[in-house]
Amino acid sequence: MVLFYRAHWRDYKNDQVRIMMNLTTLTHRDALCLNARFTSREEAIHALTQRLAALGKISSTEQFLEEVYRRESLGPTALGEGLAVPHGKTAAVKEAAFAVATLSEPLQWEGVDGPEAVDLVVLLAIPPNEAGTTHMQLLTALTTRLADDEIRARIQSATTPDELLSALDDKGGTQPSASFSNAPTIVCVTACPAGIAHTYMAAEYLEKAGRKLGVNVYVEKQGANGIEGRLTADQLNSATACIFAAEVAIKESERFNGIPALSVPVAEPIRHAEALIQQALTLKRSDETRTVQQDTQPVKSVKTELKQALLSGISFAVPLIVAGGTVLAVAVLLSQIFGLQDLFNEENSWLWMYRKLGGGLLGILMVPVLAAYTAYSLADKPALAPGFAAGLAANMIGSGFLGAVVGGLIAGYLMRWVKNHLRLSSKFNGFLTFYLYPVLGTLGAGSLMLFVVGEPVAWINNSLTAWLNGLSGSNALLLGAILGFMCSFDLGGPVNKAAYAFCLGAMANGVYGPYAIFASVKMVSAFTVTASTMLAPRLFKEFEIETGKSTWLLGLAGITEGAIPMAIEDPLRVIGSFVLGSMVTGAIVGAMNIGLSTPGAGIFSLFLLHDNGAGGVMAAIGWFGAALVGAAISTAILLMWRRHAVKHGNYLTDGVMP
């Protein structure tokens, strides 16, 4: 068996050497910036993105930049030793590739311990559907190679493209994990949202630290290629402790039940691998319990945990809302256009079936799914059945969206408590997982919803629905203005998500006006970026002008994040102008008393609006016209503020003041 594993390792190493020898197939001389000078992180990312786009590796720089900035917001990409590895995984990437910039002057980049100086930037462009391909193997090899101090130093000191490419082609490689007899064993899992850079570099640093400390360290990488280096049963059984270095859910986490675990961000091992291993060795293992002792760093605040749970539940419920709303809307349109009202109401007719299918997704499934996956976010798989039960109870007592949220939180926290306090011998693991957890959780969460908190929540939900239905005049204007402010305040951030959740909650209760407001406002920021850069290009930097060329298309699709690059560059003036115009748009749509029951339809919402007696054409004109009016106001304000800033030297552009 030992000989088999040695032979397997030798074959693996040979494959890795062949892969590393071809790293240059994923880059090009024109994708290398040597001794570059950038004034900001955004400028560096934009410059490298433009180089990849010029090589035909990226179809849409805007979509790619949006994804890169989204990844930047999730966690640090500066990895120490002067290295930053920003990356984006999106359909805008035609072919996996990377670009490199060595900097003449270090940039401040967000790292594990706060901002740090960076003089080497490697930008990875990752397509979403290339897992397991040679391209992805090359990218994973690259990120592993960046953990090699000698190779990284050669790249940083390269003065010509040939020297840099030669450093990438170096045959140096990583060493296999050494096996130390009578030494403790640490099992690890690394995983990051993109599944490339941090996943493999964190694994490499943990293995290096293990060799240095004389500890058996085995790392399972859950990356873009799926699970690599899967931990064996022997490794898990002999493990003293486990380190989870991840920012996404661990796959098959039940394998680690009973092993004391240390959970940290995926970038943590890159800077503090030895300290993490030493800390993990202090954790105590109990073979008689299945409860994992976790030392979570950093500990999530209740506010953060609640937000993540709600957004997780919503992310699973939205496809049901979109599908159900669209099917129901199509059935209604067919009945109206072709005069099929009788067929629409005739039980068991084909049109009635579609009506019931769409209505069932919205009225029956949506609430239990929302509750179940809100609970799942808090307590993993054991909370699913109790979450579904709590959602079903919410349906039974008519507490709607609000009941789903409350029920999901009850089920999630209840099952977390049960997991932490109900401890049985490991012989009863199956009984605990497949019987006690779902039965106790269902009885507990279901009973609390039906007989304790459900009725008060239903009263609040029904009161809120009645208030929303009764809004008119100044109240509707105020609601529209508030939603407009929230939608454009942070362009897809927490405030925007809070408005989105409110609108979905209202929609689930049969109130469609708030989402009509939200959908119209989403176009304002995108239209403003395009209009302002077209009308006065000299007031904007080159990357802002490039962004503006296609942002309007993202606006038609209902995507606000396309305006983020401009907002990051000049937040006060840009966000301020977006918000003012969006408040006007929201107020106009709110006053029109129109509704929208299909989220995510973008410009096609024009055909799905609930006109409430105003007429379909007038509702569509008013809804889209409100977005144009808001964009015009935002554009005028932004140009005025930007012109003043440029004139007084408070903002520097690539052009000359007109």
UniProtKB/Swiss-Prot annotation:
Protein topology in the membrane: Multi-pass membrane protein
Domain PTS EIIC type-2: 306-641
Gene Ontology cellular component terms for the protein in this record: plasma membrane
Phenotype of the disrupted gene, per the record: Cells lacking this gene are unable to transport mannosyl-D-glycerate.
Reaction(s) catalysed by this chain's protein: (2R)-2-O-(alpha-D-mannosyl)-glycerate(out) + N(pros)-phospho-L-histidyl-[protein] = (2R)-2-O-(6-phospho-alpha-D-mannosyl)-glycerate(in) + L-histidyl-[protein]
PROSITE patterns per the UniProt record, alphabetical: PTS_EIIA_TYPE_2, PTS_EIIA_TYPE_2_HIS, PTS_EIIB_TYPE_2, PTS_EIIC_TYPE_2
Gene Ontology terms describing biological process: phosphoenolpyruvate-dependent mannosylglycerate phosphotransferase system; phosphoenolpyruvate-dependent sugar phosphotransferase system
Domain PTS EIIA type-2, first and last residues per copy: 25-171
Keywords (A to Z) from UniProt: Cell inner membrane, Cell membrane, Kinase, Membrane, Phosphoprotein, Phosphotransferase system, Sugar transport, Transferase, Transmembrane, Transmembrane helix, Transport
Chief place of localization: membrane
Periplasmic compartment segments: 1-313, 380-389, 455-474, 522-551, 595-620
Localization: Cell inner membrane
Phosphocysteine sites (modified residues): 192
Positions where Phosphohistidine occurs in the chain: 87
CDD domains: PTS_IIA_fru, PTS_IIB_fructose
Induction remarks: Induced by mannosyl-D-glycerate. Repressed by MngR.
Coiled-coil residue spans: none
Its EC number(s): 2.7.1.195
KW Electron transport (keyword) present: no
Residue ranges annotated for the PTS EIIB type-2 domain, each copy included: 186-282
Transmembrane segments: 314-334, 359-379, 390-410, 434-454, 475-495, 501-521, 552-572, 574-594, 621-641
Entry remark concerning the domains of this protein: The PTS EIIA type-2 domain is phosphorylated by phospho-HPr on a histidyl residue. Then, it transfers the phosphoryl group to the PTS EIIB type-2 domain.
Its job: The phosphoenolpyruvate-dependent sugar phosphotransferase system (sugar PTS), a major carbohydrate active transport system, catalyzes the phosphorylation of incoming sugar substrates concomitantly with their translocation across the cell membrane. This system is involved in mannosyl-D-glycerate transport. Also involved in thermoinduction of ompC.
Protein name: PTS system 2-O-alpha-mannosyl-D-glycerate-specific EIIABC component
Organism whose genome encodes this protein: Escherichia coli (strain K12)
Taxonomic placement: Bacteria, Pseudomonadati, Pseudomonadota, Gammaproteobacteria, Enterobacterales
Gene name, Swiss-Prot/TrEMBL: mngA
